[in-house]
Amino acid sequence: MSKNIQRQRSISSISSRGVDRDRDPASGGLGLLSPYNSRSPLAGLHHSPGSLDATANQLSRPTFLLERKATEDIAKLDGVLFDDIPTLGSSNDHISSLGAGSPYPTINTSLAVTNPNYLSASSPGGPRRRANTASGPLSPAPPASPIDRLSKTTNRGSFVPSTARQPMNSQPPAPASSAPPPKQRTTSPSVASPPSQTRSQTVPYLSSNFGPTANMYGQRQPSGVDPSRPFHQVPLPPPPMSPPPAIGTINSIMTNIPPPPPRYPSAPAAAIHLPGPPGAPPPSGLPPPPGPPPNNTTNWQGTWIGAYGSYIPPPPPQQTHRPYNPQPYKTVNGQTIAIPPPPPPTESMQMSATYIPQGDSYGEGVGIPGLGMDDMAAWSATSQSSWLGGYNSIGSLAPTNASDTAASTPVDAYGSHNRDNSTTSNATSSGASGIPPELAAQWPLDRVLDWLQANNFSNDWRSTFRALDLHGNRFLEVGSANGGRGNFGMMHQLVYPRLAAECISSGTGWDQPREREEGKRMRRLIRHIVKGETPGTGMSSHTRKESISNTSLVPTSAGPDSGSPDTPIKAPGPGFSVGHPGGNHRKLLVGNFDDEGAHRRSPVASEPSEVGITFTERSSSNRGYSPAGSPAPTPGLFSSSTAPNLASSPGGRFGGHRNRNSTDSVSSNAAIYGSGVPPDASQVLRSQMNFGDMAKDTRRYGHDGGNRPSPLGDNASNGDRSAGASEPPGSAKEGKSFLSIFNHRKKKHHDDPDSPTSPMQHKSHSLGSRGNASETSLERPGSSVSTSHEHNTPASSMRSRRITTGRIFILATLDYWNYRMVDVSDVESASDLRQLICINLGLPDADGAQVYLTELGKFDHEDPLDDSQLVANKKVRADAAGSLKVFVRPGNMAGLAVNIGQSQNALSPAHLPAGAKMDEDTYARLNGQRRRSSSSPPASRQNTLTGGEHGKPTSTGADDDENKDPKSDDIAQQAEAHRIEMERKQQAYLAKRKHARENGNSPSENGTGSYTGIVGPKVIDFDEPRNSPFEDKKPFDSAFAPQRRAPAAPLDPSATLIKANSLSKRGSHQRNSQGSVDGFPSKRQGTGMTESPKHISEKRKPTNERQALGGIGAALAGMGRGLGGIAHPGGAGQRGTSPNRSSPGSAGESAGVASSTTDRGEDAKSRKPISSGNVSPTSSARTVSDEPPQLPKVVIKPRIFDGDSSSDEDSDDDSDDGLFAKPLAGRGGDDAAAKGKEPATKPVAKSPMSKHGTFWNDADSDGDEDPISESASNLNKRPSLTVNTKRGRKGLSVTFTSPDLPSSAGSKTAAGDEDDRSSRGSKRTPNTPHSEGWDSNNDKDVKLSRRKSFMEKDTSIWANRPPTDALINNLEDFFPNLDVDQPVLEEGELPGDLPPSPIAEAEEPHDQQQAKSMTTSRISNLYNDSDTLGSDESTLKALERPASIVSVARKNTRRSGGLGRMKSIREVAHKRYTQGAGAPPPVPAAPNNSNNSSSSGSKNSNLMRRKSTKMFNANIVQIRPERGSMILPQIPQDHLPSLPHNANNQIPKRQTTFRWFKGQLIGKGTYGRVYLGMNATTGEFLAVKEVEVNPKAAGGDKNKMKELVAALDQEIDTMQHLDHVNIVQYLGCERKETSISIFLEYIPGGSIGSCLRKHGKFEESVVSSLTRQTLSGLAYLHREGILHRDLKADNILLDVDGTAKISDFGISKKTDNIYGNDKTNSMQGSVFWMAPEVIRSQGEGYSAKVDIWSLGCVVLEMFAGRRPWSKDEAVGAIYKIANGETPPIPEEVSAAVTPVALSFMWDCFSVNPEERPTATKLLAEHPFCVFRDDYDFDQTELYAKIKGTWNTK
């Protein structure tokens, strides 16, 4: 292994623990890995002449070592140092102790041996170790050796360095590079290795050409842990002696290094910061920036930098700089500017944050960019420690230059700052903060401790500072390092850990948030100390000599400039920063990331050509121009242009770099502590996004929103300001996350604002930001070109506010209509709050503005809020939702005149109050006669400028004052003329409408049908009829042509007036039924809102000519679908319109096509939306069909009837309860209607439809006749219509009826028929049985009690689940919300044709074909695809079932050859449960015999229950009627007609969809309710257990609710695959977000517990049978590994045929060892049925034998008729059970039952579970469970009690 590689590894392994080797006097500057160290593993290695001095061979290395220090002390070195690196001499004891190290070496001037290789570097893990001081406090300087004298005379012209030591206090130090090798070489070393070489393969020598005054060549970054090295000012480096060679290596630039100037006069003679090596002088003659050392063969550059993860700074630009020419910048705004920009870097000077090594880089890893190449002369993005920031960032002190002040000229500024303009973006590498050593010397430890006490810091803080010895420079850097942010590394690595220990030791306790706030306060106070301020005053401006790193170049303002319309200064290059005023400006990034005044350009927005060109060029280059031609604002007037000026990234706090496309500052510092930047900011900027992309501003670039100057200030984002302040700013509109950085930050004001006409106020953009007028530009305020202005608001406090709390908004308005959202999160004082509100509202001045509390719609304000009230309301009422709303009445605004002297904000169009009277005038005045219409949203304005053409720069300052008044007067005159013209047009428009109305509602001249009734704001005249605005009047020749739309409104206004309120309460998306007259024009205005209360919406044009037909013709429109007849089931497709919803004059369905309902009756293909040009902005979008409907092919002779007018009086109550109470057969007054009697006086269901002759079909009668018998004769009857033109009363322009049908032929009048049909044909809101609104207002005889659960109708009913026969014959009772006779299922799609389920468990009857051939009154021949139920517009469209389309096509195919066959719910259920001849069910059927429960019918029902279809893993969909209707949508069936069936006539397997209907409530439990359900696919009845998580139980936490729902899955998973005759079968489940529906097998009857409570105890034979069945089910469960754990009489269902079934597995548990004690079993179950081991488990668990104990309790319960432990309460029972007592058997039970029964109970009550028998053993061996052949449940007393419970007729 070569020596060089060894040496490289030596450097790479330098210690990072930060312990200064100065502390070890014996270190001697030798590293443990030095080949000259006898204790080093490298000792004895051969050293080539390339690294050793050949002339020093006279001396032996060990001798020299022994002369300096004891050899045995070398081992005490904490780290490893390269031995031949010179250490700093007697002048290094005041080097700053902070910083991450410098890429430049230091030299030991005290060594007697001259060796150019004595360089020191730090390890990758931490700060570079310090060089040993020769005369410092830790070690004396060694005496001079003969090598010094030798090197003075050897090889003068070669690269042998000079060894002359110069006293630091007398003259600049010589670059003594002592080297003590055994021999010294006399030949010049070769040039440094090429870039491809690994780092530190060669160590460059120092050239002796520099003479005795040459020093080492780099700045030095002080350590963060060295208290002995206070910060020191850097002297000015001399100009270079010669240009560097154009070689892309590290040595190419290291030539002609001059001696440094004298050190700082007052500095101690211990430490000095050596300036960086200069580069080639720019052609302009400006002083050069620092460069790397000259051609030295020492290889510290490559190794050092990589050693601690930093980057070497690039050299200054090598290209020819553009000479300074201030003229283009002077003429931008017609005025001169104080400071023009310096020459910019070229585009080649670009390096991104992710450095990609090029051919000229060298070193390990990604390498270090080569120095000296022209193409590398770029602003370093990854290392802002560039030549611009040499002094500030790396630690070299700024030179003492009298001209280097804030008032220096641009040349002076550049000359003094071009070497120190940038800093690194890393906190660890942004070292020196420019603290004068005199100031540091004023803060010894005692004063620091006293200062802490004086500022109310706790004793823990004082102890911490005392223990850490924080004083002087280290103390001041805590708050002022890193661009004013403070030294976070020290705070988090030293101070906070020590403070935590102190707090714990002192007993006060470590409160991290509190101490962090204290730390922020401390840093803020220290920053004030460094700035020379008091905390309460504005920070003093600091000159560049003392400036922190990020205020490097730009001259800052002479004083604070709060409130002044400054122009932000665009710095010309990296490190150049701009000052910014404090007042009334928002900043995009939190605290600007640079609260000390150094704003940087965004890495993304800064394009390569942005620097050094004139403002005109910049504003039009790259992204500077708005693509839509949005005019660039006047640079002097608005401190912004259209370029997307991104915020400076967090690195801005560490230095003002403006590297184009550089993202290192954000990517590396976005999420650092206290930066206030959301974590995703780094990723956003890394992906080259600008804030316009992030905010997704729809108004960007001007053409869809407009970039106008904002009322929030010169720099406010124009994209989120609107002309009327009617929209919230972007910071408010956008969400949290990264966009929260758009927040407004209110800065404190300063007392000395510049004059509005001050030359420092209106500066051109020569140095200004070019982007702040962009669509999402930085919200950072502009700055005048003067001293960098510091904000009062500390950055730390701003960051803490931004991080800790959410934003608070208030809504402010000037005109009651448009509200501006104002972010008041950080505003505390009333004056600031008023100022902020006024700024957001565009008021130039908050003086005199009065603030009132307001609410939406409030127009009167009396008492303004004083300051205390304003602050109190803000604290109490303001929140993130903007609950606090204020109205602001401007104070001294004379006619909205703009006071330029106050603020340039007033010149923004968005500055004006929205909705003000002179909004048009003001906008025209501000936009050069450009007006905006009243309908145009304010936010749609582009970025327009004041008083000039778009994009044309105008003068500012006093010139604006001179030009403003004549212009304003002219604009005001024009605005007044415009207003008069608008009023004239409005009057003409209203007159035209009035004239059209008086002329018989004829269309207006422009073809728009007139409409009236709107008088003033929202005054609607319902008594004045009008034509629909959507109709075209056309001749009456096509009056009888069929139309899809309903006829025009009748002249009778009563229905409209009566139902207006009722229908206005309805939703806006209800479906129109086809049988209704649903499109009548209404007098109601559309739901859309007009722009102004005084303006009518724009004129509407007709959309459909066919709608112009008059009353009779229009009435024919929907008749084809509305006719009743045999072939059309009773209102199947036409029953959708409720009587009190679809009256011809229904006001809710306004204006024909303007109906607010969705036209579900139209085929989607036959409708097209109205063009936007024909619809008023206020009218909702509606669809109109231009295609006439298909007329019915079947015509039936009708009879005419006049609608019953018995219900002329109606109320506006929209409840339709009682309208549809269908009479049941065999009940009181209902029989009369069923028998054909005409109850003439019986009140008809209140409905305006009956008044206007609305038809109803009578296809599904309730009569006793069998509809089949008359089906043939009914087929010959064709429905038709006759028109009665004699209008005997209002509203009867059209009357129609349906032909006589079996149930009503000759027996019912039309009115009676209508009443009967309304019982189930009308729309009904499907309320649950116990929901509100069930009570009916109808007659008591008509009203039924089915509004409640049928289990409550008769208290004599023991069971709550009727047999299936009773269900079939009383379906309308149990499904009250459905029309059970509506044909919704095609016969071919019923289970008879295709298996509805993958599990085709039930065999289909062979006589299906007979049923198919039969036609009844329920067959529909008019049920076509244009109907609601047949179209995809139905509610099933949401299911996206392709089968729906297939079903329609199949029906159409079938319809072309004949009539289709539709089945109703009643038929499906009857077919499922009746295995008879396939005849349609009687409606109602004749009463069965009393023994039907035990007859074959009962057995068939039981058989069908056993074949219940399981629906697990299938798609389960609940079918609900449309809201407000009983009509079901069409049910697309699961069939694949396009796929051929196989030989077995089976369809391919796929996921089946089961659809079910929800019926009555049949049970309630602790955890949910049980409803009757029906599987529409199979016709099976279901018990649907709905368990809904109570939000209160979950505390309103949705996640917790979901967890509770997930817990319910246990029951389903447990029972999914179980199948036993004595267990309730689980058929499926439907999971929802907060509820779950479990589908169970429907078991008629009730629970054993309910039967016991009703009928008393059971006889022993019944108990034995039920016990045997329960035990059989229990044994099955145990075999399956399931513990029931809640077995009791209430959880065992008793069927009406005597079958027992175990149910309720809610707390069941599945286990592998059913009879082994499971310790995880907890106390579950019901107390009185619990086994002893459950109560006293004590961690031992229990087994399935707990169910045996519970079964014994159930047996005792059946014998006694009451629960066990009936005389004890729960607590007492628990106590007794835990003590081993068994449930007492009452004496009457003991005397009545047999000993076998007693022995069974005693066996079950075995206290020891080991002695308790298992279920299988009891079932097989116990005599009580023996099956008895003579047992017949039908012959028992229990059956005699319950046999008459349900009448199945």
UniProtKB/Swiss-Prot annotation:
Q: Which GO terms describe its biological process?
A: MAPK cascade
Q: What class of enzyme is it?
A: transferase
Q: Which residues form the Protein kinase domain?
A: 1556-1825
| InterPro entries to which the protein is assigned, alphabetical | Kinase-like_dom_sf, MAP_kinase_kinase_kinase, Prot_kinase_dom, Protein_kinase_ATP_BS, Ser/Thr_kinase_AS
Arranged from A to Z, the UniProt key words for this protein are:
ATP-binding, Conidiation, Kinase, Nucleotide-binding, Serine/threonine-protein kinase, Sporulation, Transferase, Virulence
Q: What happens when the gene is disrupted?
A: Does not affect significantly the growth rate but produces fewer conidia. Inhibits significantly hyphal growth upon high osmotic stresses and in the presence of cell wall stress agents such as Congo red, calcofluor white or SDS. Accumulates chitin at the hyphal tips. Leads also to a looser distribution of spacers.
Entry superkingdom: Eukaryota
Q: Which residues form the signal peptide?
A: none
Functional summary from the UniProt entry: Mitogen-activated protein kinase kinase kinase, part of the mkh1-mkk1-spm1 MAPK cascade that regulates vegetative growth, conidial formation, colony surface hydrophobicity, osmotic stress, cell wall integrity maintenance, carbon and nitrogen source utilization, chitin distribution, septa formation, and pathogenicity.
Q: Which family does it belong to?
A: Belongs to the protein kinase superfamily. STE Ser/Thr protein kinase family. MAP kinase kinase kinase subfamily.
- Which named protein is this? Mitogen-activated protein kinase kinase kinase mkh1
Give the residues annotated as active site: 1686
This entry's Enzyme Commission designation comes to: 2.7.11.24
Q: State a single Pfam family of this protein.
A: Pkinase
Record-listed ATP binding positions = 1562-1570, 1585
- GO molecular function of the protein, one example? protein kinase activity
Reactions accelerated catalytically:
L-seryl-[protein] + ATP = O-phospho-L-seryl-[protein] + ADP + H(+); L-threonyl-[protein] + ATP = O-phospho-L-threonyl-[protein] + ADP + H(+)
